[in-house]
Amino acid sequence: MVIYSINVFAVMSQDIKLLRVKIFDELSKIVDPEINTSIVELELIDEVDISDSNVKVDLHLTSPFCPAVFGFKICQDVHDYLLRVDGVNDVKVNVSNHFMAEQINNQVNNSPNPKKLGELPKKLDEVPKKL
């Protein structure tokens, strides 16, 4: 369960408080595919660190041997859902206590960030002929 000191929360700027609420709203939409329950309800989130527009999420899975495909999906969802939040430009996910943690972290944290790719072409003739 994520626990914050009241004193630390009290000194946070209003913008950071609002961003934290938006982040937890998004995290609560992510469901463990095996149990069909929110990862927030399951208390899988260990820590959320916000620095400017960068977010780092530490989490664990329900079991160290949770099927890797489910672990990857949960972590990728955390990454992708949080990138949709206004005010978040980069997300790093760190899953621990799982037999495939290193591979999952590498794959998720090296996935494309649409906010860094720029705007996609709207028409086929706008696509560059050579990359």
Per-range role (PLM):
Residues 2-131:
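Domain-level signature for proteins that mediate thiol-based redox and metal-cofactor handling
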